[in-house]
Structures are given as structure tokens and as C-alpha cells.
């Protein structure tokens, strides 16, 4: 049954069979932000079942408003299911935040965040993502970042306190993942508007100073704030090089969706096909240069799981193209080794071989055209149909 389930999931994922030994492998998880639109039920567990059937393996639970006590039972059931499987659960805190506001505004935001921290443990969340909100009375940079370092240090401590101590086995027997997994990572998300704290540089600086945090790269926000910047695979390579140099590590948590933007500000999410932010360049980067990465991508699109599957299909296509290119290069290398040539010399020889062939074909084609262009000799109008040898007819003769 276990083998059957493994092969069933492989087939559903479009043939993601293990690569040969020795070949570097990237860990990629994809899923929607919330219960799938196509799910007949509306509980988290039913949503997880539907996501798995679609060949996806991650989900982000949205706690846009305060978490109610009656939600906790289904959160715990989802946590048990994710612990027993390879399904990744994540949590998103309140969208509206004012961590840089007045003391009253900050405390109100922190009280909302507390509920998502409690739910994060119940659901076995790998990441709990938070927004910071407006700059308030702070200027971008130094002082604001220092304040947030203090705030998120307290948030991380609180998450670890809620997660509990694995030595206290009796108290936490209902949460077996406490003994096997690390506490949830606190994600700090990049923002999509100029008046909101959250450039990539700001997020990286705070994460660098607070252990237990992780930058959440929202590609739609990055694209909008950069006036439509994320257009090529090189743009993504530059972004992840920046993160690797300034933050380190190989684990990444990202959001992706189409976005409508104006003057450096995100207006609202759209489906990927209707946006100038395309997933193909990102897929190309992941396929070509992402072997060192452990990455989770959450679909924020209004189409949720449909665009998550769309992203998975484009990644598979990019990966297939790369494998074809590698196979061609390996074939060229084998031929070069067999003939005692350098691969570059083999490429030149192939061109030299091809050029005469092409010229021969062209000459044959030209000869055929010349023959076909020969005008037939005119016949006499006389009744005996004898060939006319008049001088005007000889002018048309190719001989």
C-alpha cells in the first residue's frame, strides 16, 4: 500500500520520479493560500485532501481575522495529518498590521498575532508569516529596523514558548511534532507599497539580526514596488543571489501571483495569465540554477490552486527543456571522446559537414528549378504538327 501511494503521488505530480544518484536535487513545494476553490468541503483537512489529489504538497492557512476557539479542533486535525505525511502546513497572520505605530496600535497588532502563534503550533506550521505595516513616524532604514529587531525577537521567543519543551512529554503528547520538528519559523514578508515597511533590503537586515526568522519573498510585491522589475530569469537570479549573500541559507518561502500595479504600488492580485508578472522566467531560473534551494511557493492568485498547478506545469516544462539540453550536450561529449576531438572542435566539424550538405541540396534544388524553367519548343500550327525550324523559335532553344 505504501509503494502504491508513492507511485500514485508521483503520477499525479506529472512524473516527478527520483533523479539518478549523484545529481543535485531541488526541493520544491507548491500550494494555495487557503482551502482550494474546487473543494466541496470548506474545512482545512478537506482542503488538504483536495490539494494532495491535485499533485500539490503545501498550504497556507489564512488567519485574516482573529482565530476563534472553534477553529482549533480542525487546526489540530490538520496538524496530525501534516505530521503523518509529507504535506507542508504554513500560517499567515493578520494582513493589517501596525507594528511601527503607536504603543496602542502595536499592542493591538501583537494581540492578533498571538492567536496565529497559538494556531501555528496546532497546525504544525513550518512558517508563520507577518506583515509590518506603515512606517508611521519612522523614516525608512535604521531606527525602524532597530525597533523591529526588538519586536520580532519577542515574537520568536513567544513562538518557541508556545511550541513547548520536548522534555515535558506528558503535557505535549497531543502534539507529537513538538518532539521531531523545530518550532515554526517567523516569516517577515516584503511589502508591495511605497508607504509600507518591507523592501527586500529592510527584511533581510531584520532577519539577519533575529534568529528564528526567515524572509518571505512576495514576488508580486517585489515586481510592483520595482515598477515591473521581475521580467527575466536573470532578475530572479539577482534577487536570490542578494538573499544568499546577505542572509545565507538555502531555505526560501515565497508568495507568487499576478499583480496589477501603478507607480510602484501593488493595487490587487490577479491571475498569472493576466499580469505582466510571468512565472516562466522564475521557472527557468529554478530549473537551471535552483538545485541548491529548498523552496516553498504559495499561490496568492485569485485562482488559488489553479495557478499553483499552472506554476507546477511550467516548472516541469522548464525542467524537461533543461534535461533535453543536457542530453544533447552529453551526446556531443561522447561523440567527441569517441573521435578523439574536443567538444568545441566537434561542433565546428559538424558545421563543416552540414554546410556542404546544405550547398549540395541548394545546387540540386537550383538544377531542378533550371530544368523546370525550360520552355517547351513551340509546335507548328500546320495540320501535320511538324516541328518548326524557323529562326525565331531557335532563340528560345537552350541549345
Stretches found by the model and what they are:
Residues 7, 99-217:
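Active-site acidic/histidine proton-transfer and metal-coordination neighborhood
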Residues 2-115, 214, 324-364, 376-380, ...:
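N-terminal pre-domain/capping segments
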Residues 39, 43, 69-74, 101-112, ...:
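Alpha-helix N-cap and loop-to-helix initiation/capping positions
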Residues 33-37, 62-66, 94-96, 133-135, ...:
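Active-site beta-loop-alpha junctions enriched in small/polar residues
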Residues 28-34, 59-61, 89-93, 128-130, ...:
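Hydrophobic faces of well-ordered beta-strands that scaffold small-molecule active sites
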Residues 48-53, 72-90, 117-122, 157-163, ...:
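Acidic (Asp/Glu)-rich catalytic clusters
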Residues 273-274, 282-365, 371, 377, ...:
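C-terminal accessory extensions appended to soluble enzyme cores
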Residues 139-142, 197, 223-294:
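Gly/Pro-rich active-site loop or hairpin
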